[in-house]
Regions:
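Helix C-cap/helix->beta junction micro-motif
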Residues: 134, 194-195, 224
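Short beta-strand
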Residues: 44, 310-314
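PLP-dependent aminotransferase-like
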Residues: 111-169
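PLP-dependent aminotransferase class I/II
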Residues: 54-55, 76, 226-305, 309-311
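N-terminal "arm"/small-domain region of PLP-dependent enzymes with the aminotransferase-like
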Residues: 7-71
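Active-site phosphate-binding strand-loop segment of PLP-dependent enzymes
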Residues: 145-209
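Short loop-beta-helix segment that forms the pyridoxal 5′-phosphate
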Residues: 73, 85-107, 120
């Protein structure tokens, strides 16, 4: 958020605000270069990172164990996968670790290599970018504002035709914050399995939901092998620079393909060590959820009484 002095600089340097380049909102260096605003003065609202910042407990532990950088990480990430399994009640043998969820999204798309994919939109632009790199055609099913951006499951399924090979859903969705309940998601996954369609669910924001158990599709990975759930720690755990993500699928053949084509030691030693610390910090988990839930309710109530604004209940 620029100050008044910087706004005056826009006018002096004739910067056309209507012809700005496209870049990720967290790319502060590019924003600094284009708008001539020191990145230290920018308050970034686009990254959706936990306002509490990195866990103090994790900071202390990490500072005391920086020697982990002198060792190669476990190539199989055994301890980390066990920590992930305990964190989200998943079988560690069904878990693949990656250099952020972005690497896993890219790896999944390249290995599934769909000729056509169906996206639930509006949504994270990285999905369509990765699909374009392999020459896949994409169809976007748009959530409707008049329906408060909630999904009409039956209508969505009518678009899951036999020529679609991959369905991508961000749940809860970015940027609408709307979420699909687990029962509805199972209906989608079940019908997709009958039509030989693989489903990727990005749960980057699921820990922010009022009731995680009502939304997460991780339990469904035990029953459906045409499904992969992807998560990361960038948002909830305020660690976007760590680049730690994980995916969960019960498809042994697909897991084998992912491991064969993934670079070894994809996640470095610091990332693997810190990832375990983050997922085991239950105090931080509960403190964050308490803050987000109370602030969401407060801000929703305030915005509801302001002229010109309509907040949408995502859950």
């Amino acid at each position: 958020m620029p100050n008044t002095q910087n706004l005056e600089l826009y006018q002096e340097r004739n910067i056309d605000m209507d012809k700005k380049p496209e870049f990720h909102g967290s790319d502060l260096e590019k924003i600094e270069e284009y708008y001539h605003i020191p990145k230290e003065e920018i308050i970034c609202f686009s990254a959706n990172v936990n306002p509490l910042g990195l866990s103090k407990k994790v900071k202390k532990e990490l500072a005391s164990n920086l020697d982990v950088i002198t060792r190669y990480p476990d190539r199989n990430y055994t301890s980390l996968r066990e920590a992930i399994g305990n964190y989200c009640s998943a079988d560690p043998s069904h878990i693949v670790v990656g250099n952020g969820s972005t690497e896993l999204i890219s790896l999944l798309i390249s290995q599934r290599a769909p000729k056509k994919a169906l996206l639930l939109g509006p949504t994270y632009s990285e999905y369509s970018r990765e699909l374009s790199l392999i020459g896949a055609s994409t169809e976007t099913y748009h959530l409707q504002e008049e329906n408060d951006f909630h999904l009409n499951v039956d209508d969505f399924l009518s678009h899951c035709t036999e020529d679609v090979a991959l369905v991508i859903i961000c749940n809860p969705n970015n940027p609408t914050s709307s979420a699909i309940k687990k029962n509805d998601m199972e209906q989608i996954i079940c019908q997709c399995k009958k039509r030989n369609i693989f489903v990727m669910i990005d749960e980057t924001y699921v820990e922010f939901a009022p009731c995680i158990e009502e939304i997460t599709a991780i339990p469904l990975t035990k029953r459906y092998d045409n499904l992969m759930v992807i998560r990361g720690v960038s948002k909830f755990y305020a660690a976007p620079g760590l680049r730690f993500g994980y995916g969960i699928t019960s498809s042994e053949a697909f897991l084998k393909s992912l491991h064969q084509h993934q670079n070894p030691w994809s996640l470095n030693s610091v990332g693997a060590y810190t990832g375990e610390l983050l997922l085991k910090d239950t105090d931080y988990f509960h403190e964050t959820r308490a803050l987000i839930l109370s602030e969401r309710a407060r801000m929703f109530a305030r915005l509801s009484h302001m002229d010109g604004y309509k907040p949408y209940a995502g859950y």
